C-alpha cells in the first residue's frame, strides 16, 4: 500500500537503503538472506504492475559478487544497483597511475541487460567504501592507498570483524582533496585534470551516472565541521549557502564555476551521443598500465566511442586501431590519428 500510494503521488524511484540487512535471523549475520531477496522480488512485482513503472535501486555496500546478486538470478529484483567498486578502484588508478586493477575489474564486470543498470558514482555523502575493492586491491595496495588519502587530508572509518579485529570500511575525504596530490605529482599540478577525467570515465561508463552535489563545485574537505562534530563523514558534507554559491557560479574564473561548467559539459556531450546509452555495449581494451581505455557501441551499432584516459602525469603514446584516423574528439571536434599522445591525465572521447 505504501509503495502504491507513493507511486500514485509521483515517486518514480525507490532507493532501498542498506537493504541487505533487512531480514533478521537468529544465528546468522543477518546479511544477504534469501528472505531479503524474496521481499525485493515482491516489491519489483508491485512496481511492474503500476502504470508509472517506478524503479527500484538497492544500496548494498558489499563485495562485488554479493552486490551483483541484487539484480536477481532472473533479473527480477532491483532495476539498478550502485556500482560500488568503481569509486575506490578509479581513484586508486589515478593516485598510483596504474590501470591494472581498474582494468581487471572492468573486464570482469558483466554487461547489464535492457531494464537493468549500474548506477555509477565516485562520491557520495558517505565515504569511499573499501569493501567493494576486496579481491582487487591487496593489503599492500590498500595500505599505500590509505596512506596517500590521509596525506591528502582524509580520515579512515573502521568496522569490526568477528567482534575483534578491525578493517577499514571507508575513507572519508572529498574528491577534491583525494585527487589533490600523488606520489608522482607531489605539488598537485594536475589535480584539476585528474578530477575532470575521473568524472569523464564515470559518465562514459556503462550505466547511469550520479554526481554528488558537492562534487559539482570542487568542494574541499570541511575540516572546521569535522573538528566541531568529530564525525568523520562531515568532512564530505559541506553545507552551502544558496546565495553565496550562486554568486560564485556567476564568476567565470571562480573555482566553483570552473569545476561546475567542466562537469556540465561532460553531461551535455553524453546526452548527445547514443553510444553513451546506459546499456550500450562496453568493451575494455588493454593499453598498458598508464592508460585506461574502453569502447562503447550504440545499441543500433552505428556509433562507436573510445574513452581513452591517460592516468599518468606525463605525456603517453597510445596506438589504437588504424580506423581511428576517421574519428573525432568529442571535446573539441578535432580529428585524431590512431597514434595518440594524450596530455597528462587527459581523457579523450573519440567517436566515428
Q: What is each PLM-predicted segment?
A:
Residues 1-325, 330-352:
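Active-site and adjacent substrate-binding regions of carbohydrate-active enzymes
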Amino acid at each position: 500500500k505504501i509503495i502504491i500510494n507513493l507511486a500514485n503521488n509521483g515517486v518514480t524511484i525507490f532507493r532501498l537503503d542498506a537493504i541487505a540487512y533487512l531480514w533478521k535471523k537468529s544465528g546468522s549475520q543477518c546479511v544477504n538472506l534469501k528472505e531479503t531477496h524474496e521481499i525485493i522480488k515482491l516489491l519489483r512485482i508491485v512496481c511492474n504492475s503500476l502504470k508509472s513503472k517506478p524503479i527500484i535501486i538497492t544500496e548494498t555496500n558489499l563485495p562485488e559478487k554479493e552486490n551483483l546478486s541484487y539484480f536477481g538470478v532472473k533479473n527480477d529484483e532491483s532495476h539498478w544497483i550502485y556500482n560500488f567498486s568503481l569509486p575506490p578502484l578509479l581513484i586508486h588508478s589515478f593516485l598510483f597511475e596504474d590501470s591494472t586493477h581498474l582494468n581487471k575489474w572492468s573486464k570482469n564486470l558483466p554487461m547489464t541487460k535492457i531494464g537493468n543498470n549500474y548506477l555509477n558514482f565516485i562520491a557520495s555523502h558517505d565515504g569511499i567504501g573499501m569493501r567493494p575493492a576486496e579481491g582487487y586491491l591487496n593489503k599492500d595496495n590498500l595500505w599505500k592507498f590509505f596512506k596517500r588519502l590521509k596525506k591528502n587530508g582524509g580520515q579512515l572509518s573502521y568496522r569490526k570483524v568477528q567482534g575483534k579485529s578491525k578493517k577499514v570500511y571507508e575513507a572519508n575525504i572529498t574528491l577534491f582533496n583525494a585527487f589533490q596530490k600523488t606520489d608522482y605529482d607531489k605539488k598537485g599540478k594536475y589535480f584539476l585534470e585528474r578530477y575532470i577525467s575521473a568524472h569523464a570515465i564515470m559518465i562514459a561508463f556503462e550505466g547511469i551516472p550520479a554526481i554528488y552535489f558537492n562534487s559539482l563545485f570542487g568542494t574541499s574537505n570541511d575540516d572546521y565541521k569535522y573538528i566541531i562534530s568529530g564525525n568523520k563523514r562531515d568532512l564530505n558534507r559541506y553545507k552551502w549557502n544558496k546565495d553565496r554559491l550562486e554568486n560564485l557560479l556567476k564568476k567565470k574564473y571562480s573555482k566553483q564555476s570552473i569545476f561546475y561548467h567542466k562537469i556540465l559539459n561532460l553531461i551535455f556531450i553524453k546526452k548527445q551521443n547514443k553510444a553513451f546509452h546506459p546499456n550500450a555495449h562496453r568493451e575494455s581494451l588493454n593499453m598498458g598500465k598508464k592508460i585506461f581505455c574502453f569502447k562503447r557501441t550504440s545499441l543500433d551499432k552505428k556509433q562507436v566511442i573510445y574513452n581513452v584516459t591517460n592516468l599518468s602525469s606525463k605525456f603517453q603514446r597510445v596506438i589504437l586501431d588504424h580506423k581511428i584516423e576517421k574519428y573525432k574528439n568529442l571535446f573539441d571536434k578535432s580529428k585524431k590519428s590512431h597514434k595518440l599522445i594524450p596530455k597528462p591525465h587527459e581523457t579523450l572521447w573519440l567517436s566515428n
